Amino acid sequence: MKFGKTYVTHQIPEWSIYYMNYKQLKKIIKSIDSAANTNVDESKYPEVISDTLGSFFYDLDRDIEKVDSFYNTKFKEYNRRLNKIFQVLGYQDGQITHNIESSEELDEIINILIELKSLFRNLKWFAELNHKGFIKILKKLDKKLTSILSQHSGVSVGGVSNHNQEAYMGSRINALPFANGTEASNCLDSIHHILSRIETRNDVVQETIPVENNETSISALIKNDDFEGLKKHITIKSSQKFLISTLNKAALANSTKCIDVIWNQLDMLYDDSDFNGRNFFHQHIISLGKAQFIREEQIVPGEVTNRLIGGDNGPDNSNKNDNPIGLLYILNKLKHKRLILAEDHYHRTPLHYASQYGLVEVTRYLVEFGVKWGLINTSISIDDVSIWGDQEGLTPLHLSIIGKHPKTTETLLGFNKAQTLTCPNLLLLAVRLNSPQILNSLIVEGNIDVNYTDIDHRNETALYIASKLNHPDLVEFLLESNANTEIGENVFGWTPIFIAASEGFMTIVKLLKEYGASYDIVDDSGWLPMEHACLRGHLDVTDLLLPKNEKLLLYDMYHPENNLPRIPSLAASPVLTGSDDGTVSTSSIDKLPEPQKNTVNQFYKQLKNNSSNNVSRSTSPKRNKRYKPVKSFGHRYLNEDESLILLTLGTTDLRDTNVPVELNKVSLAKSFATELDTALSLSITCRHKLTNNPVEPPVVVDLPLEDFHGSATDPISFKLSNDLTVNDVIITFDIIPTYQVNKKVIGRAIALLKDAYTKVGPNLRSLNNSIAIPIIESTNLDILGTIRFEYLQVLPFKHKAMSIARSDTYWKQLVSTRVIGHRGLGKNLSGKKSLQLGENTVESFIAAASLGASYVEFDVQLTKDHVPVVYHDFTVAESGVDIPMHLLTLEQFMGFNTPTEKPTHTVDDEVLTRGKQRAQSSYQLSNNHNDDIEKEFANQRDERMKFTKTWKNQGYKGNLRGSSVASNFVTLRELFRKLPNNVGFNIEVKYPMLDEAQLEDMGEIGVDLNFFVDTILKVIYDENTTGRDIVFSSFHPDICLLLSLKQPTMPVLFLTEAGTAPMYDIRASSLQNAVRFSKKWNLLGIVSNALALIKTPRLAQVVKSMGLVCVTYGTENNEPELAKIQMRAGVDAVIVDSVLAVREGLREHNETMNEFEDSPTE
């Protein structure tokens, strides 16, 4: 998962405004790249960079000051509270020297220590997250500057350094207290030590009340309201603390007679020795609100617990009887009336605690008596922090909302009707907590403007936040309350419909449209909501957001003056990034790092000098400006003694919603000794099985994981050298405290990779890759939780013909878009009026080449005896049953389509090669049988095929005799020998993903991935002795990365449905994920379903901006006009069925391109 998202999700909600503004700093860095893509005079470029960097470091310094100030303030306050506990316990040199008078006092101390531990932990979490943010943003800046400086190597950019991270962290940040966290760590260690000592010592409590079993005895008397019996325990010598504690029990039991007995002995309702400064009302209300003693609570290890949420009794304490008869009885007897609103050491009144715990009736009594006695000024708002704020700056209303107590909130607002609330940001808090009732109260009773925005913090409205968090009920309520749909945040200029579209929230998009939200506007980067939705694979949402003027979607990178001007949203910056030359900014598209610019420069030299095989064209500077780099040969691959382990936490399957790292709940009492209540991390280490030494440094991941599939697009990798394999290593998963210097291992899981997957036969594997192993606690060997993961080992490929000597590139950015023949001359379709050549046949490939196809595309699979053959479907329907290819031998497979006539009676290869026209009647079709028995046999075979799933789903079968000019099946080896050397091969390596295998009902077993790829590569290196151009492609992500890592010369394209069809592997689920995957594994580019780029042509520039080739496929490509739309947008190649028609249709466009290139440029 990208840091930008985890940064937000890992923040302490009530401290969110004090974090560094990572998003804003990231936007400034991206503005450098936007300037690089425009026609800025290179002489002015150093000035542009200098100005941008000045803005960046100014904002960065303000963020550092904000984080440091907040951290120091909080630490000082928390440390003061901790020192007070040290004094009470006499804690020094690791020893507790004082005894506690009662178990109740001990419980109170433990409660305070646990709260302080939570506070220090949150503060440490706050510091660590900001520190990591500063490192990340400076690293991102250095990476961007390195890329730009290498690109503009001829321009002197004085004073600009690309080593800011090291310099700035060392001189400016690391010296500050929050950056090292030593003081907070020491405080946490002290608290942990005290709690551990208290749990193991029995002599800490020294009961001062002389009656044996007095607590049990007194509790029984109070429960029965036995005031006569209670009198025997109440004496003049009873301490004030004891009397207050006993009065609290009597009030809880509503025992009014016992209250009278205790009342007569009490002088005051507070004890000066109370180390929290709390009086009776504080203590009583806290006791009313608590469901259980805090040490008995269950927590999820490693998660941030919100200490401000009052107990587990539900909204407004609904799971507990809120009937404070005892409290009301005492209030009516009270003389010292100011006690009901007295503050403790944390500046909290009893009303604060009543609001925190959602005690509706108690809150009402306190407010009513406070107003009646003149203690509450009704002219002051209940959320006025200057009057009602505690040490955290929280008022009773804040606490009620944070605790999600709607009735308590309504009660507080009830006496505040005349006043408008002073903290309108409570509206945004209520939305984040998904509480419609509270939201309604704030708008109606609190008079908060429904369109309030926090200008200093991203300018997000309640409607925007509700849309972002996918709360349809809140969105509908806000829209009914006249929320403005056109107010957006100030980072990307996104209105609510942008965020809903990008996340694929269809219900919210429909609601926003219904209430008139504009969706033909663009954000700061010039992108429409529809384009954001399409990029992320939400094509159902895309169709809802079609602009009224559909021509807004068209994009011409060659003639930008033809592009219609786009209307920015009200939230967009006054000047959109972009330029007159047609460059498209992608700053809000979650861009990946730019490729190395020296590769670009080398590529353009080759393009200029080595274009003899193509249309002779010069590349104008104007055109150079637009093109991003295309990869060259010699990409990183595995040496013969190396292998790679790729480990994915969780799974790549979007249907699997199991948590990758699941930790069982533990009691807080247990967490004292185990440190499970601290922030936790997962340390993953690859170790040598015999020596236990790490093979590579461990990879540390912070818990909890917010994205269950985030690791899929960026798996954890361990490189094994010196011929090490999975047989020689183990993987350890250690649960460790995130912030402690000495990383104690709390729990461990161990995976023996050799035996992790169930064996299903030689050179075979199960398509189910998920592995679950238990985490064993280190102290008592209990099961702490479970880890789920997948792994893939990439083994090296060895062949004597493999080398990286060739330094040019197969794929040059040509003037005319390439045409690639789909399955040869085209995919066979049912109902075609013209005669079709059989798909994936030699005749079809030759015909495609003769008609002008640069490459022919075909599918390769392995037979049972491991021979690569050319065949498209996963199951071979010609057999009459749904049988997978890997269960048929070559002989069986080839026999299914062997003609009964002599070859001379089928099709004239010479005619196909020449491309001459012949009358259809002159062909001898393969279903003209000379023998009735053979005819009957063929009919029976065709009839059997109609029972297969392929036939039932499609109504036909490609290369079927009678519906096409059918021919023999062919092996990959034969194709190399039969097709002309000038015809390039686009080899689609066909391998089923789990969901595809399940859809085809073909069983969930496949050929071992390494063996599968190695077998195909061996045939290619054996046969390709003439330097034929070869490009690989595959829908299977693992096949693509194996092909990339096993050899250095043949480029790989990743095939993607781009959201046009459901794909459950997250890497194949959208165009955005396809781009990320291709970039990560150094692939040449992507082959996308054409529909996505026809709907939103500008997305081609997202692909190109990453230095990736963009190819499309699909029936839409058979329409020349649709092919032209893609070509104008920058698509490199189209895979088509109608080779001749599309090639002729594109000729006009190519001539236009010639005129464009030959025209003078400024």
Swiss-Prot record:
Could you say which residues form the signal peptide?
none
For the GP-PDE domain, which residue ranges apply?
Answer: 817-1146
Q: Per its database record, what is this protein's job? A: Glycerophosphocholine glycerophosphodiesterase responsible for the hydrolysis of intracellular glycerophosphocholine into glycerol-phosphate and choline. The choline is used for phosphatidyl-choline synthesis. Required for utilization of glycerophosphocholine as phosphate source. C.albicans can utilize GroPCho through transport and intracellular hydrolysis or through extracellular hydrolysis.
Q: Which SUPFAM superfamilies match?
A: Ankyrin repeat, PLC-like phosphodiesterases
Where can this protein be found? Cytoplasm
Task: Give the protein name, as stated in the record.
Answer: Glycerophosphocholine phosphodiesterase GDE1
State the disulfide connectivity. none
What this protein catalyses is: sn-glycerol 3-phosphocholine + H2O = sn-glycerol 3-phosphate + choline + H(+)
One example of the protein's molecular function in GO is: glycerophosphocholine phosphodiesterase activity
Species, as recorded: Candida albicans (strain SC5314 / ATCC MYA-2876) (Yeast)
